[in-house]
A protein has these predicted regions:
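Conserved alpha/beta-hydrolase catalytic His-Asp/Glu region
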Residues: 250-310
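Conserved HGGG/HGGXW glycine-rich cap/lid loop of the alpha/beta-hydrolase fold
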Residues: 127-171
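Catalytic histidine-centered segment of alpha/beta-hydrolase-like enzymes
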Residues: 348-361
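A short loop-to-beta-strand scaffold at the N-terminal edge of the catalytic core in hydrolase folds
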Residues: 119-128
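Active-site loop/oxyanion-hole signature of alpha/beta-hydrolase fold enzymes
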Residues: 163-207, 211, 362
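Conserved serine/cysteine hydrolase catalytic core
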Residues: 287-335, 344
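Flexible "cap/lid" loop of the alpha/beta hydrolase fold
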Residues: 213-217, 223-254
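Mobile cofactor-carrier "swinging-arm" domains
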Residues: 1-114
């Protein structure tokens, strides 16, 4: 085998560096391609880097607690045929010629951000280039389009991607009206109209799953496929009032931290920077009011009841669930349409698309026919 570098990945638009927090393997140990190799902490979340190839881990270049730019050399994988001198030369050459990635050096397929007027609102939308029906990504309660940072690149390799900050979230207008599901879906639909999108693969997480389903109902023929990840609003499913209330009301890091930890199976995934980013968002004008309106509407349950009564009108869907979800309880599978498929993800909480991104990406790619 050739000498294979392990490099600092780029997860999402805003990532320009990462910190090594844990190595699962030591130099000399044999790797299997795809197994967990190390954990990297970003400003959003901590995630695992998988081994890029099978073979001995010949050298670890980046130590624990070391912060390095995207693309930097972390380790080297190579079989015994490669001499130590060859490994040393490879590392020296890499370090000598390495230039940190910049926006100017990013590929033409990189996501571009824009603000799109939707009635009296403005929505922030990220898009990648390409031909064909796009993948439309709709995040959950309290999140933004960066919630898909571990999914965008994998999906963009197969189809154009449109990621949207829902009303009340991210950089979009904070006006959500009374927070009704129909209003959120209508705003997304108008944004897609502005982009000229007539057909799309709709993918929604949590509240975004309910929005995606409602959008598919309100615009027959729009959804080429429908993927719902830990979705709210399905039969037998309940959204945690404790989470919604805690998220909406928390004003300090020490209060928000245990709330965010409910999102994931491993609380260590919630970074200090992620907590601070959420607090910064909540301090924006209108953000608290938007969250309160959306939370009250979800807890009222009327929109979800209306959605459940029309599931049979929806196209076949993939529902991705985690048994460790502490925010949205699993639906009654027997009450779902017979054409729907359910996939369970082990070792994840409410955020399987972040916690187990490779598995979720593979499921989505299969669903969209990639």
């Amino acid at each position: 085998m050739s000498i294979v570098p392990v490099k600092m990945p780029k997860w999402g638009l805003s990532m320009d560096e990462g910190k090594v927090v844990h190595w699962y393997k030591a130099p000399g140990e044999r790797l299997t391609e795809g197994e967990d190799l190390l954990d990297i902490e970003t400003t959003k979340i901590t995630n695992t880097v998988e081994a890029p190839a099978s073979g001995p881990l010949r050298r670890i270049v980046a130590g624990v607690d070391e912060t390095l730019p995207v693309g930097a050399l972390l380790a080297v994988v190579a079989d015994e045929a490669a001499s130590d001198a060859a490994i040393d030369a490879f590392i020296a050459d890499f370090q000598t010629n390495f230039t940190p990635e910049t926006e100017a050096a990013e590929s033409e397929g990189a996501m571009q951000l824009r603000m799109v007027e939707v009635g009296e609102r403005v929505l922030r939308i990220g898009t990648t280039g390409g031909e064909g029906a796009p993948v439309v990504l709709l995040h959950g309660f309290g999140a933004d389009l960066n919630n898909w940072l571990f999914n965008i690149d994998a999906l963009a390799a197969a189809a154009p991607v449109v990621a949207i900050d829902l009303p009340g979230h991210g950089a979009s207008s904070k006006d959500v009206g009374d927070g009704d599901l129909a209003g959120l879906a209508a705003a997304v639909g108008e944004a897609l109209d502005a982009l000229g999108v007539r057909e799309a693969h709709l993918i929604g997480h949590s509240l975004g799953g309910a929005v995606a389903a409602r959008l598919a109902l309100d615009r027959p023929g729009l959804a080429r496929s429908l993927t719902l990840i830990a979705p709210a609003g399905l039969p037998g499913s309940q959204v945690s009032a404790e989470f919604l209330t805690g998220f909406s009301e928390a004003e300090r890091a020490r209060d928000l931290k245990p709330v965010l930890e409910q999102l994931v199976a491993d609380p260590a995934l919630i970074s200090r920077d992620m907590i601070e980013d959420v607090l910064k968002f909540k301090r924006l004008d209108g953000a608290q009011e938007a969250l309160a309106a959306l939370s009250a509407r979800m807890l009222g349950g009327g929109d979800f009841a209306a959605l459940r009564s029309r599931l049979a009108e929806l196209p076949p869907a993939l529902v991705i669930l985690s048994r460790g979800d502490a925010v949205v309880s699993p639906p009654d599978e027997a009450a779902l349409p017979a054409s729907w498929r359910v996939a369970w993800i082990d070792g994840a909480g409410h955020m399987p698309h972040l916690e187990k991104a490779a598995e979720v990406n593979a499921l989505i790619l299969k669903t969209i026919g990639a």
